[in-house]
Amino acid sequence: MSSLRTQSTGGGVLGLSSVGSDRTGATSTAAGSHSHSHRRHHHHHRSRSAPRAPEKPPRKRHLNPGHSIASIPSQIKLSMLNSGLISFATEELGSSMSTTLPTAPTELSQFPKLCELRRKFPVLYRVEFQTATKVETHSCRHAMKPANKEKNQNQRCIPYDYNRVVLDPIEGEPDSDYVNASYVDSILKPNAYIVTQGPMENTVTEFWRMVWQEKACCIVMLTKTFDFIKVMCVQYWPASKEKDEEYGGIGVSVLKEEELANFHIRTIKLYKKNENDEITEERTLLQFHYTEWHSHTCPFGNAVLEFRRRVRAVVGSTIKNESGPMVVHCNDGGGRSGVYLAIDANMELAEEEDAFDVFGYLKKLRQSRRGLIENLEQYKFVYDTLEEFVVCGTSWFPVSELSQRLKQKSIKNPTKMNEYQREYQQICKQTPRFTIGDCAGGHRADNREKNRDVLVVPPDNFRPYLTSFQGNSYTDYINAVFVDGYTKPREYIVTEWPLRHTCGEFWSLVYDYECAAVVVLCVPPPGSTNFPSFWPEGKHSKKYGPVFTIDHISHNHYTNIKTWIFRINKKIVSLTELMAGVKAPPKTVQLFQLTCWPMGHKVPTSTNSLVELMNMVERWRQRTDYGPVAVVSPDGRSRCGVYCAANACIEQVIQHGEVDIFQAVKTVRRHRPQLVENMTEYKYCYDLVLHYVLHYLNKDMNEKK
């Protein structure tokens, strides 16, 4: 670290050796050289008899206590740290920074202010993180044994000797007591968790031995088995319900699996048998597998909070739980595991004492295992997620309370805002903002003309990339974004009505992503040149772009709804694909058009027709392997969000008997902030779900039975 020093000058300016020292030194040298040259030139013309003025001794630079770091007001000090004028180091700042570090748990009512201060001065995150992670290290002798090294994913995340999980040894097998796992305390309970690495081919047996021995209450898995062309963790449970697996004398079978957009929940049975192949003991536990948390990234906070809610709904509080610890793992038992523990333990503290202790718990985590919360971004994510929990609170409620809740939400409080307005205002505050750089693909010169509105452009991370080759003048771009549903990620693809020169791209989207259905939520004026027809209206075929030909198969017209079934034919024009003999099989899609939502209207004229259309789409998808749904509106922003959010809520009602429109709307706005763009659309989402519950729910539930 560069040292910090003060210069006692007339103005009392703070001098910093770490700021511009090279440049200052170079300037001083140049100036000194110039001055010396000038003096020699001046002496040459001076009278020999003129007495030479004595040179003043250089002014001593010394540390003035009045100008020390400690004397600088906190706000100025933070600004200097934040702008890089001074660098953070414990030995430099000493006790002067102690006031910025939390010394006790923060009350929930004060936590948003704490987060706001850190957003204003992001350096505070770094100060906390660097301070908390400078903890005393402990011996890892067992993990470093030659026989055990091959049982570790890497040498960065290994257990300390003092709190490692010790397996019951197997007779005749030295070091069979080792597994890369550590006991970790929560804030309120010792040994509440076991943090371990994702099992490898040679450690699956040790993993299940540990789960059985410790009587684990559940398994929380925070990684995909395969991510970014790398095996992160082997699949340590049976691939199908029909086949059991055995690991070290422990039988493992999957009884049930439930899929949601961001995670899966598996019910797993463990059992042991005797010599006669009879089951002598069996247990059931749940595995909660978060599937949308990629390595080196942070997921969406509301999705992690929902995941944690599902875990705790089954497991209960760790304080009251009499069963064994919760087993938590990511790929190496490091960063992601630490993030989950920090969120879970702090929320449990909030439930008991209305407080969070993020900084204090990070110190405890790092004393328990190396690498828990491994970088600054993950530490910020913990803060952001806990703040979201405080600000948003609990927004779900049982479907049985829906009518009563909607009446309460309409009542205005003293601020003249009702609950709908407060919720929508909060959603707008938390909607992500994307920069032009985030949406670079849509702003490229060759793609700019493919957007109806240059302000509504998809982020590159969340847009579908077209893969069908249509010629050298075509790119992989279409103005569309993925939107998560309730049970599936990227369940919807939201897009705008195609322009005349983008109809080929639209059908490429439907073909490349195997969309089961296309939902069109408007009827343009007849003969409109701004909204060209992009499907064959009659019983004939039509070509769109150089590659796609759409064949009419059948059509039906109902009250306020029209449907067509089309066959999409693709012509191979890529020389590489032709030489490789690539085939492009035709694909079938059904297009649904809602005809009761006129242009210029904020909501349709018939709520029942829109709900009926949703049901028709769902029935069609059940027959076609649940491909994504392409949702089309005039501008790709209005109407689509209502359809996606209401659909997700209806699925939540069916699956779990719950309603959470607030979180559903937050979810659809993650990738396109303009979705559900006003209060009218937000309120209409509630109306759609209420209509479904009152008129369709019982009938649909009976059909599923």
What are these regions (language model features)?
Residues 1-705:
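Cys-based phosphatases of the PTP/DUSP/CDC25 superfamily and their flanking regulatory architecture
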